[in-house]
Amino acid sequence: MKNVLPPFIEIYRALIATPSISATEESLDQSNASLITLLAGWFSDLGFNVEVQPVPGTRNKFNMLASTGHGAGGLLLTGHTDTVPFDDGRWTRDPFTLTEHDNKLYGLGTADMKGFFAFILDALRDVDVTKLKKPLYILATADEETSMAGARYFSKTTALRPDCAIIGEPTSLQPIRAHKGHISNVVRVLGQSGHSSDPARGVNAIELMHDAIGHIMQLRDSLKARYHYEAFTVPYPTLNLGHIHGGDASNRICACCELHMDIRPLPGMTLNDLNGLLNDALAPVSERWPGRLTVAELHPPIPGYECPPDHQLVEVVEKLLGTKTDVVNYCTEAPFMQTLCPTLVLGPGSINQAHQPDEYLETRFIKPTRELITQVVHHFCWH
């Protein structure tokens, strides 16, 4: 019942006080079950039907889908329930206590992005959801900060096909209609160890990796020359060498060397094509040294994403906000939601505060975000 729904700031406070960290390191990783229970209770109080979905392959993680209304189409509002880990020594405040100071709300997840659910709940407390003419769906996903397992699983298993979706990531209320993808790979070279006094008796993995890196750099230059999307601030696919490790002693021929790298493809570039380009680039090394070079995924790949610029969702949101949609270089769950329906990324707070010590959301976003949610629900679910 709506009269038992807590005030906006208390909802926000409860969300921040409920840890839901995602991490690849098991000791840091946390279940989001408690947070899902909170959200499920609140949306039930608003009259929504609530379904909690276990996400396979995770450490006790769940999605939640709250729905109201009947028929086809409608609107999906979605976001992730998890946060990144925090560096205790760099925070000046308790990350799990919502702190109001200097027109800012501080806490882990205030901007990225647990707070978005407080905005949705607050905007809907005055809406009679029984009178909506089209369905309204609220999706809370798991593990966005690591594998995006929640969004991947939901998009593969749901039969829902809303008219459109909005992901409430922190965009400073600037609507985003496209972003790059992300592919992270590990290149491994297996050499043959031996005493450094006789190099011919071994195969130095560092030397082979040096050769491989030269070919990878040629691929980087080729991607920059062949592909272009003017709307992006970095208008070409980027390739970054992020981490390398090999060997264990100066007087020993290096037996193993490992390189971690990523590629951020433009929308429209297929992941299979990029994998093919990387394998082609490394083919000369593999041919010279059969069986000594392998490439594997570090994390599941994320494709690039683009919402058609002439879609009704883009037109409506641009009109409501009085601003044009934009594109960004970072990734969200949008590619997976886009398989269900046209999707925009649009939410309160700045991406510059995401993953930072003393994360905060400026209070100036509160009123316009509440108004925006009310307006898009009215447009897509009442008309």
From Swiss-Prot:
> From the UniProt record, which GO molecular function terms apply?
acetylornithine deacetylase activity; zinc ion binding
What Pfam families does its record include?
A: M20_dimer, Peptidase_M20
- Asked whether the keyword Zinc is assigned, the reply is yes
Name its cellular compartments. Answer: Cytoplasm
Top-tier EC class: hydrolase
Could you name the domain of life of the organism this protein comes from? Answer: Bacteria
Give the matching Gene3D superfamilies. 3.30.70.360, Zn peptidases (3.40.630.10)
Q: Which UniProt keywords apply?
A: Amino-acid biosynthesis, Arginine biosynthesis, Cobalt, Cytoplasm, Hydrolase, Metal-binding, Zinc
Keyword presence, Hydrolase: yes
The family database entries (CDD domains) matched by this protein are listed as: M20_ArgE
What does the entry give for GO biological process? L-arginine biosynthetic process
* Catalytic site positions: D82, E144
Locate the residues binding Zn(2+) 2: D112, E145, H355
Positions bound to Zn(2+) 1: H80, D112, E169
Q: What is its main location?
A: cytoplasm
Cited InterPro entries: AcOrn-deacetyl, ArgE/DapE_CS, Bact_exopeptidase_dim_dom, Peptidase_M20, Peptidase_M20_dimer, Peptidase_M20A
Reactions catalysed according to its record: N(2)-acetyl-L-ornithine + H2O = L-ornithine + acetate
As cofactor, the record names: Zn(2+); Co(2+); glutathione
State how it assembles. Homodimer.
Per the entry, what this protein does is:
Catalyzes the hydrolysis of the amide bond of N(2)-acetylated L-amino acids. Cleaves the acetyl group from N-acetyl-L-ornithine to form L-ornithine, an intermediate in L-arginine biosynthesis pathway, and a branchpoint in the synthesis of polyamines.
The record's annotation in PANTHER family points to: ACETYLORNITHINE DEACETYLASE (PTHR43808:SF1)
Give the family this protein belongs to, as stated in its UniProt record: Belongs to the peptidase M20A family. ArgE subfamily.
Protein name, please?
A: Acetylornithine deacetylase
User: What is the species of this protein?
Assistant: Salmonella typhimurium (strain LT2 / SGSC1412 / ATCC 700720)
